[in-house]
Amino acid sequence: MEPVDPNLEPWNHPGSQPKTACNNCYCKRCSYHCLVCFQTKGLGISYGRKKRRQRRSAPPSSEDHQNPIPKQPLPQTRGDQTGSEESKKKVESKTETDPFD
């Protein structure tokens, strides 16, 4: 490495700044132009103020899209209520008849 003049500020060291100015091109070569170009173009990182996007205005024909949902009856669960009790009784009878040892 070449010795650097200690009186120079770090941003004025030779090779610290590119010879050409930054531009708006997003090609691969321009994206790697300098650290700033790489961060903004290559990585998409910018710390500037973000522009506020305007919301789209609603079309004049639609009102507020607040149409109520029509009430629907809750589905009734249908099935044998005694079916589960019968299966429990079968399991109990099997456990009683099976010897453990």
Swiss-Prot record:
The keyword Metal-binding applies. Asymmetrical arginine methylation by host PRMT6 seems to diminish the transactivation capacity of Tat and affects the interaction with host CCNT1. Acetylation by EP300, CREBBP, GCN5L2/GCN5 and PCAF regulates the transactivation activity of Tat. EP300-mediated acetylation of Lys-50 promotes dissociation of Tat from the TAR RNA through the competitive binding to PCAF's bromodomain. In addition, the non-acetylated Tat's N-terminus can also interact with PCAF. PCAF-mediated acetylation of Lys-28 enhances Tat's binding to CCNT1. Lys-50 is deacetylated by SIRT1. There is a cross-link at K71 (Glycyl lysine isopeptide (Lys-Gly) (interchain with G-Cter in ubiquitin)). Keywords: Acetylation, Activator, AIDS, Apoptosis, Host cytoplasm, Host nucleus, Host-virus interaction, Inhibition of host innate immune response by virus, Inhibition of host interferon signaling pathway by virus, Interferon antiviral system evasion, Isopeptide bond, Metal-binding, Methylation, Modulation of host chromatin by virus, Modulation of host PP1 activity by virus, Phosphoprotein, RNA-binding, Secreted, Transcription, Transcription regulation, Ubl conjugation, Viral immunoevasion, Zinc. The keyword Transcription regulation applies. GO terms for biological process: DNA-templated transcription; positive regulation of transcription elongation by RNA polymerase II; positive regulation of viral transcription; symbiont-mediated perturbation of host chromatin organization; symbiont-mediated suppression of host innate immune response; symbiont-mediated suppression of host translation initiation; symbiont-mediated suppression of host type I interferon-mediated signaling pathway. Residues 38-48 are annotated as: Core. Its main location: host cell. It is found in: Host nucleus, Host nucleolus; Host cytoplasm; Secreted. Zn(2+) 1 binds at C22, H33, C34, C37. Residues 1-48 are annotated as: Transactivation. Residues 47-101 are annotated as: Disordered. The modification N6-acetyllysine is found at K28, K50, K51. Residues 22-37 are annotated as: Cysteine-rich. A motif (Cell attachment site) lies at residues 78-80. Residues 85-101 have a biased composition (Basic and acidic residues). A motif (Nuclear localization signal, RNA-binding (TAR), and protein transduction) lies at residues 49-57. One of its GO terms (molecular function) is metal ion binding. Residues 49-86 are annotated as: Interaction with the host capping enzyme RNGTT. HIV-1 lineages are divided in three main groups, M (for Major), O (for Outlier), and N (for New, or Non-M, Non-O). The vast majority of strains found worldwide belong to the group M. Group O seems to be endemic to and largely confined to Cameroon and neighboring countries in West Central Africa, where these viruses represent a small minority of HIV-1 strains. The group N is represented by a limited number of isolates from Caeroonian persons. The group M is further subdivided in 9 clades or subtypes (A to D, F to H, J and K). Interacts with host CCNT1. Associates with the P-TEFb complex composed at least of Tat, P-TEFb (CDK9 and CCNT1), TAR RNA, RNA Pol II. Recruits the HATs CREBBP, TAF1/TFIID, EP300, PCAF and GCN5L2. Interacts with host KAT5/Tip60; this interaction targets the latter to degradation. Interacts with the host deacetylase SIRT1. Interacts with host capping enzyme RNGTT; this interaction stimulates RNGTT. Binds to host KDR, and to the host integrins ITGAV/ITGB3 and ITGA5/ITGB1. Interacts with host KPNB1/importin beta-1 without previous binding to KPNA1/importin alpha-1. Interacts with EIF2AK2. The cell attachment site mediates the interaction with ITGAV/ITGB3 and ITGA5/ITGB1 integrins, leading to vascular cell migration and invasion. This interaction also provides endothelial cells with the adhesion signal they require to grow in response to mitogens. The Cys-rich region may bind 2 zinc ions. This region is involved in binding to KAT5. Transcriptional activator that increases RNA Pol II processivity, thereby increasing the level of full-length viral transcripts. Recognizes a hairpin structure at the 5'-LTR of the nascent viral mRNAs referred to as the transactivation responsive RNA element (TAR) and recruits the cyclin T1-CDK9 complex (P-TEFb complex) that will in turn hyperphosphorylate the RNA polymerase II to allow efficient elongation. The CDK9 component of P-TEFb and other Tat-activated kinases hyperphosphorylate the C-terminus of RNA Pol II that becomes stabilized and much more processive. This is Protein Tat. It comes from Human immunodeficiency virus type 1 group M subtype C (isolate 92BR025) (HIV-1). The gene is tat.
